[in-house]
Amino acid sequence: MATGKIVQIIGAVIDVEFPQDAVPKVYDALKVESGLTLEVQQQLGGGLVRCIALGTSDGLKRGLKVENTGNPIQVPVGTKTLGRIMNVLGEPIDEKGPIGEEARWDIHRAAPSYEEQSNSTELLETGIKVIDLICPFAKGGKVGLFGGAGVGKTVNMMELIRNIAIEHSGYSVFAGVGERTREGNDFYHEMTDSNVLDKVSLVYGQMNEPPGNRLRVALTGLTMAEKFRDEGRDVLFFVDNIYRYTLAGTEVSALLGRMPSAVGYQPTLAEEMGVLQERITSTKTGSITSVQAVYVPADDLTDPSPATTFAHLDSTVVLSRNIASLGIYPAVDPLDSTSRQLDPLVVGEEHYNVARGVQGTLQRYKELKDIIAILGMDELSEDDKLVVSRARKIERFLSQPFFVAEVFTGSPGKYVSLKDTIRGFKGILEGEFDHIPEQAFYMAGSIDEVVERASKM
């Protein structure tokens, strides 16, 4: 392959000169003689290409030889990546020796064509009551997990990985984009303790790494997920955090000298997001279901980054600090969370009516809270007292002990089937369990467990 030399270094941006007849293509990976990998971003003319460094540019100097690999970055894919931690280039960073890949795929790939895509809306049962009832996931759908610090985004993610790995024998890929190294480390140990590490591939581009790494690490993880999908599997693809993917794009864009757009974001924000999201899709062979943690800067949902993410999501799971402060986990807000799948044509009339009934009861309770705070429960009508009693039972029944949180709760985790979830909430709404005290509903699995618990009270 052609050889060039470094002519300019500006931080993470490196200009390389090649012979006029052998200029690398955009997105080609170049290898510097020091071992650093560069990715071509722009062709400047006259044999010059502008690249972004996928690693620290410390110690580079002008005149160093650069070789064109002739391909985009290629990463290992297949079952050998399971249970391993890799960086953006697919190199192992867990000190467990080489990966021994079955194949290597380019990280820049075209999204599946219209003919290949599958349009069935099959539900993915997660075993988590509040998600299955209020904001059901679709196989091959995209889910946004919105929440502040400490309300349980990571624990929810780990429970989903665990449930799908064990109950559906599915594989998961976790891309830590701009992660804190400590969080990545915690996640690895949690997965090991839950015995699901052999079903998860972990790809990390930590906070301290150059913007090129953080921008590409989501694509590396996605490429590994696509390989599993093309083998006919149903894969889960987790991204934490999609906001930091956007932020890395902003840094790269500024370094390349592009004119910034609204709020200083890159002018190509929608395109970059689209390139990633359009590849996360189901084909007739298998599905990729993605769960993306979304940080909302300054709680402003109209900020260009979350606003661009919203356009691609099928379900939004909103985690609420108020619910977490009541000790109800998972702290999903049933009134704020939405799903495109909550439609009688998709989930059926019974599921739809129960979910809307639950939301209606909780909404009425929310309206009555002010009256209760001022005048007390005694001033309510009999009907309203019944609504409050049922709403409080529903609130508590939406909590659930997680398998990955057994060390915190001290109670064994529960997986609740969708059928049991609907039966339980339907019974509460119809007054079947009005005689059972509300504390019996807290941190329970199915409704049978609640009845059994109440009989011992």
From Swiss-Prot:
It is found in: Cell inner membrane. It is a peripheral membrane protein. Belongs to the ATPase alpha/beta chains family. Disulfide bonds: none annotated. Its main location: membrane. This is ATP synthase subunit beta. Its EC number is 7.1.2.2. Keywords: ATP synthesis, ATP-binding, Cell inner membrane, Cell membrane, CF(1), Hydrogen ion transport, Ion transport, Membrane, Nucleotide-binding, Translocase, Transport. InterPro entries: AAA+_ATPase, ATP-synt_VA_C, ATP_synth_F1_bsu, ATPase_a/bsu_AS, ATPase_alpha/beta_chains, ATPase_F1/V1/A1_a/bsu_N, ATPase_F1/V1/A1_a/bsu_N_sf, ATPase_F1/V1/A1_a/bsu_nucl-bd. Produces ATP from ADP in the presence of a proton gradient across the membrane. The catalytic sites are hosted primarily by the beta subunits. ATP binds at residues 147-154. It holds the Pfam family ATP-synt_ab. It catalyses: ATP + H2O + 4 H(+)(in) = ADP + phosphate + 5 H(+)(out). GO terms for molecular function: ATP binding; ATP hydrolysis activity; proton-transporting ATP synthase activity, rotational mechanism. It comes from Haemophilus ducreyi (strain 35000HP / ATCC 700724). It comes from the Bacteria. One of its GO terms (cellular component) is plasma membrane. F-type ATPases have 2 components, CF(1) - the catalytic core - and CF(0) - the membrane proton channel. CF(1) has five subunits: alpha(3), beta(3), gamma(1), delta(1), epsilon(1). CF(0) has three main subunits: a(1), b(2) and c(9-12). The alpha and beta chains form an alternating ring which encloses part of the gamma chain. CF(1) is attached to CF(0) by a central stalk formed by the gamma and epsilon chains, while a peripheral stalk is formed by the delta and b chains. CDD domains: ATP-synt_F1_beta_C, ATP-synt_F1_beta_N, F1-ATPase_beta_CD.
